[in-house]
From Swiss-Prot:
GO cellular component, one term: endoplasmic reticulum membrane
EC number(s) stated in the UniProt entry for this protein: 3.6.1.43
Gene: DOLPP1
Catalysed reaction equations from the record: a di-trans,poly-cis-dolichyl diphosphate + H2O = a di-trans,poly-cis-dolichyl phosphate + phosphate + H(+)
GO biological process, one term: lipid biosynthetic process
Membrane topology: Multi-pass membrane protein
Organism: Papio anubis (Olive baboon)
Protein name: Dolichyldiphosphatase 1
SMART domains the record matches: acidPPc
Function: Required for efficient N-glycosylation. Necessary for maintaining optimal levels of dolichol-linked oligosaccharides. Hydrolyzes dolichyl pyrophosphate at a very high rate and dolichyl monophosphate at a much lower rate. Does not act on phosphatidate.
Lineage: Eukaryota, Metazoa, Chordata, Craniata, Vertebrata
Keywords: Endoplasmic reticulum, Hydrolase, Membrane, Transmembrane, Transmembrane helix
Length: 238
């Protein structure tokens, strides 16, 4: 840094474009859509948190699919090299190319994969309760609505054209279907073997593929263990 009282030529400053979203001043809808446009960042933070605390192989695989999807988006953008909307007000963007929209591709991958997971992987339709089915339907609609709103926000905020978000959504959906099939047919049979690796045991990485309802399983196991420890504690105090 320059010493006190001394002037120097201004340095070139650049924003962190990952979380840099601009919207028209005074536009409430644009303000809300700008926050929605940050949904991919929130999703990534959620995945990292889940992996740190759960360390489940399927969650790690899901995040790997999202990373691969981003790589495919970068490749397509640099092959097609279609610019962003002409006359856009934004000076700080991650790349000058806009086809396909990475936000749209990311959210549609996340939503379609989650949709397939809820209806094909969590195969409990024969004994599922009404509230379980209702929760599944509401969550699926919410995911699809989020993907649409994020895609719409990129057009509304003049970061992309409709065709760019449309093809981004198509690419993300196709990638989600392909990655879901690959995970089910190739990776899932390998999960028990991977979970048995010494490095996996060291980092407490686990495989819950054969457990249909992990939330209920963890709840019942935790409750049973807590009661067992309570009984042992009561016996010692007598």
């Amino acid at each position: 840094m320059a010493a006190d009282g001394q002037c120097s030529l201004p340095a070139s400053w650049r924003p962190v474009t990952l979380t840099h979203v601009e919207y028209p001043a005074g536009d409430l809808s644009g303000h809300l859509l700008a926050y929605l446009s940050l949904s991919p960042v929130f999703v990534i933070v959620g995945f990292v948190t889940l992996i740190i605390f759960k360390r489940e192989l399927h969650t790690i695989s899901f995040l790997g699919g999202l990373a691969l999807n981003e790589g495919v988006n970068w490749l397509i953008k640099n092959v097609i090299q279609e610019p962003r909307p002409c006359g856009g007000p934004h000076t700080a963007v991650g790349t000058k190319y806009g086809m396909p929209s990475s936000h749209s591709q990311f959210m549609w991958f996340f939503s379609i994969y989650s949709f397939l997971f809820l209806y094909l992987r969590m195969h409990q339709t024969n004994n599922a309760r009404f509230l379980d089915l209702l929760w599944r339907h509401v969550l699926s609609l919410g995911l699809l609505a989020a993907a649409f709103l994020v895609s719409y926000s990129r057009v509304y905020l003049l970061y992309h054209t409709w065709s760019q978000v449309l093809y981004g959504g198509i690419a993300g959906g196709l990638m989600a279907i392909a990655w879901f099939i690959f995970t089910q047919e190739v990776l899932t049979p390998l999960f028990p073997r991977i979970a048995a690796w010494p490095v996996s045991e060291f980092f407490l990485i686990r495989d819950t593929s054969l457990i249909p309802n992990v939330l209920w399983f963890e709840y019942t196991v935790t409750r049973a263990e807590a009661r067992n420890r309570q009984r042992k504690l009561g016996t010692k105090l007598q």
